[in-house]
Amino acid sequence: FSPNVSVTSEALETSSTATANYKKQEGSYFDSMFSYGLAYDKRNSTYQPSDGYISRWYQELPIVADGSPIINGYQIKGFRSLADNSVLSSGIFTRAANSLSGEDVRVSKRLYIPASKLRGFEYGRVGPKDGAEFVGGNYMATFNTQATIPYFFDTFENIDFVAFFDAANVWHVDYSSTVGDSNKLRTSAGLAVDVLTPVGPLTFSLAQPMSKAKTDQTEVFRFNLGTTF
């Protein structure tokens, strides 16, 4: 159980080219939020696991917040050993952003696909688009699977070479009926190098998008620093 309380204040501004619906969200906002996570870990190791799974439920609730936003999420990732010391891992990651008061979810609370969950695409430039702005979605889901590639050098024990496949979608715009939902599956495949360092895991990846919406922005190379979950 991992509880957290956050207090934030923000001022939302829009450009002169923003649509009328987007401009309606301009203003100052104050949020006091309570969030928590519940995890169930059955991995055989927290460091480079080769068997088992870990699942996590996440919820963010308003204490005092404009628009009363609520975010629910669930994720699960499993591991299985293959031949030649290779490990297959697959995971699902989901989020939903809504409002307890029935109001529209403002732009800063909307959902974007995490950079590590959809390689081959620019972060924050995938999904619903209002005019020139990518505005995120109310719902988001990803599926990721990868397998480590065997190698023959013991000195590389902190490095994994992997082949991966990513699939993701972010969709629905509650504040406007004229903005397209962008409800389309995005997919990519590629190769990556995961390096475990004292400051955390580093990932270098080369990805090729396989399916996309016409407005999505792609990229071939990606560098990530952060969690492996």
Which sequence ranges carry the predicted segments?
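C-terminal beta-signal and terminal closure region of outer-membrane beta-barrel proteins
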Residues: D174-F229
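C-terminal outer-membrane beta-barrel translocator/porin domains of Gram-negative envelope proteins
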Residues: N4-I159, A163-V173, T215, F223-T228
